[in-house]
Structures are given as structure tokens and as C-alpha cells.
């Protein structure tokens, strides 16, 4: 097994309070060849990440104008962040202004929209939020399922956007991402091991189906509070979906903007080709030393067909169909 220092800080267990250590000792646990996971409120977390989740739940002070971008890992999070930043930024900087000063050209979307669990509450229970004091709305992000995440909102009606993606493409994207940050070759045996874990519901932030269902049901119960978006629809009808996102966030496109091509300009600014080609995303890193370029790969729908066997496809499809039965959520 990898030593502690070889693991990403989110996957270690060196930042735990005594209270959290005691809690973990009472939780269901799982250990693969590299890291330990524990199941808290129905979701699997690395130990340090669980500490961050608890810190967030207890100490975050929401504002009603906050915008929270949620997703299961490797579901189009970077793209959702870029689009949301660009939509909100229009109120401060129209596209006709100097484009070179746009924040997306000088920072990665993950640098602009921090994760509660990784960027804010991982190292401290009381992060400094003063840099957001002049921002309205404030943009944050999370991978927590809705029922866990809502504890930190303390009843606030702030906007929550969830991006959902086909689990098979999520799996392939996660497989490639793990290989990048661990500097290992893309291994078929690793994919097969990850596949079995995914099917068993044991993965970082898994089970996938419970995660998606939490936001799906939340969007049905309170559509003004939670917007459920699909990665595949973003790819097939980007203009329609960006308009939908902008309206939900409270920054709808005017007729003049639509007529002048603002939606197309925004989509081009946030495109994989444009963002991945920027110097900051070719050479920059997160504070956890992840290369920004590792967040950009193919972004394709259906890439899983190049990697999963028909038997694997059938197995995971049957599991998803069973787990989502009666919910009206389909893939």
C-alpha cells in the first residue's frame, strides 16, 4: 500500500480531530490497495475529506445569494464552473469589453470557484472568507450528496446547480484522472478494479446512484432551489442549456445579448479547446499539486464504448436500472 506521504492530502488521515477519529471508528469502512474510505451519512469519503465535510457542516455561514455548483467527481465540474463564472461575470464585464481581463483567462475554474471539502475546510474549520466579502453572488462547489451538503446551508434558499453525467463515462474519466495524478500508466487491471468498486457502490463520494438521486429528488421537490442538469444535454444542445442555467442563476440573457451572439461567445470562451489551450491551464497547479491540465481530457459523450466490454456495459446498466427504479431518473 502507498505510504501516507504518497497519497493526495484529501486521501490521508493526518488532519483528524479526536472526535472525528472516534466517529470513524464507528463507521463502515473499506480499504482498497491505496486508501481507506469510511461511509458517513450514506456516502463514502477519504478520512481527511470527511473531516472537511464535518467542518463545513458545522461552520459554513451561507448567504442567500450564494451559488453552489454540485457534482459527482468527473461529471463535468470544470465546465460547469467555467460556464457559471462566465454567466455571472457578464453583469460586471460584457463580452464587448476587453476579453483579456476575463478571470477565466488568468485562472483555472477550480481556482475561481473553490470546493468546500478541498479548498476551504480541509485544512481548517474556519477558513478566511474575506476575499469573498465584496462578491455577490459568491460561487462555491461541492461533491457532497444533497442531504449531507444541505446541513451546512442551515435553511438558506441559495441556488444549487447539479451536473449529472452517465456513470460509464464518469468511470472512464476517473480512471484516466487517477492515472494522471498518480503518474501511473493507464492500466486495464486498474479499470477493472474500479469498475467492480463502482458496481458495488464503493467509490469516493459513491454510491453514484444515491448521489444523483439526492439531487434529482431535491430538484423535483424545490425546483427554484435545485437545478438538475445533464452533461449529455449540455453537449447536444448547449445554447438551450446555457440559457436555462443563466435563468436559474438569476442572470438571464437579454434579447439583445442573444441577437448579438453572446451565448455563442460564452460557449466558445468556456470550451474545452479554448480553456485547455490557455497558459494558466497548461502550466498551473492546484494547491494540492494537481496539474490544471489534468482536468481537461476529451469531454466526449460515450467514450466508455472504447473501454468497457459488452459484459461490463450490461452489468452496470442492470444495476443502474434497478437502483433508479421508480424515480423517473433515467440514463
Curated annotation (Swiss-Prot):
It is an enzyme of class 2 (transferase). GO terms for cellular component: cytoplasm. 3'-phosphoadenylyl sulfate binds at residues 74-79, 165, 173, 231, 297-299. GO terms for molecular function: sulfotransferase activity. It is found in: Cytoplasm. The keyword Cytoplasm applies. The active site is at 143 (proton acceptor). Keywords: Cytoplasm, Transferase. Belongs to the sulfotransferase 1 family. Sulfotransferase that utilizes 3'-phospho-5'-adenylyl sulfate (PAPS) as sulfonate donor. This is Cytosolic sulfotransferase 1. It comes from Arabidopsis thaliana (Mouse-ear cress).
Amino acid at each position: 500500500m502507498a505510504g501516507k506521504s504518497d497519497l493526495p492530502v484529501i486521501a490521508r488521515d493526518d488532519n483528524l480531530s479526536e472526535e472525528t477519529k472516534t466517529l470513524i471508528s464507528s463507521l463502515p469502512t473499506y480499504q482498497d490497495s491505496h486508501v481507506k474510505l469510511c461511509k458517513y451519512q450514506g456516502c463514502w469519503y477519504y478520512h481527511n475529506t470527511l473531516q472537511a465535510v464535518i467542518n463545513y457542516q458545522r461552520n459554513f455561514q451561507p448567504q442567500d445569494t450564494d451559488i453552489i455548483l454540485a457534482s459527482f467527481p468527473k461529471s463535468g465540474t470544470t465546465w460547469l464552473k467555467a460556464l457559471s463564472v462566465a454567466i455571472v461575470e457578464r453583469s460586471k464585464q460584457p463580452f464587448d469589453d476587453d476579453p483579456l481581463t476575463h478571470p477565466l483567462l488568468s485562472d483555472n475554474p477550480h481556482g475561481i470557484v473553490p470546493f468546500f471539502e478541498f479548498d476551504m475546510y480541509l485544512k481548517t474549520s474556519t477558513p478566511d472568507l474575506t476575499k469573498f466579502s465584496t462578491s455577490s453572488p459568491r460561487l462555491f462547489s461541492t461533491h457532497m450528496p444533497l442531504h449531507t451538503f444541505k446541513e451546512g446551508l442551515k435553511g438558506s434558499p441559495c441556488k444549487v446547480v447539479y451536473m449529472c453525467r452517465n456513470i460509464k463515462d464518469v468511470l472512464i474519466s476517473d480512471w484516466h484522472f487517477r492515472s494522471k495524478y498518480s503518474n501511473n500508466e493507464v492500466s486495464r487491471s486498474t479499470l477493472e478494479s474500479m469498475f467492480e468498486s463502482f458496481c458495488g457502490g464503493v467509490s469516493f463520494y459513491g454510491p453514484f446512484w444515491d448521489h444523483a438521486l439526492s439531487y434529482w429528488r431535491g430538484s423535483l421537490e424545490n425546483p427554484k432551489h435545485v437545478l438538475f442538469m445533464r452533461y449529455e444535454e449540455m453537449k447536444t444542445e448547449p445554447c438551450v442549456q446555457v440559457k436555462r442555467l443563466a435563468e436559474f442563476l438569476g442572470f438571464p440573457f437579454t434579447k439583445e445579448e442573444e441577437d448579438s451572439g453572446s451565448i455563442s461567445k460564452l460557449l466558445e470562451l468556456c470550451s474545452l479547446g479554448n480553456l485547455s489551450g490557455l497558459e494558466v491551464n497548461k502550466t498551473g497547479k492546484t494547491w494540492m499539486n494537481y496539474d490544471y491540465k489534468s482536468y481537461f481530457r476529451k469531454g466526449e459523450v460515450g467514450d466508455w464504448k472504447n473501454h468497457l466490454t459488452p459484459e461490463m456495459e450490461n452489468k452496470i446498466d442492470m444495476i443502474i436500472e434497478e437502483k433508479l427504479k421508480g424515480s423517473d431518473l433515467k440514463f
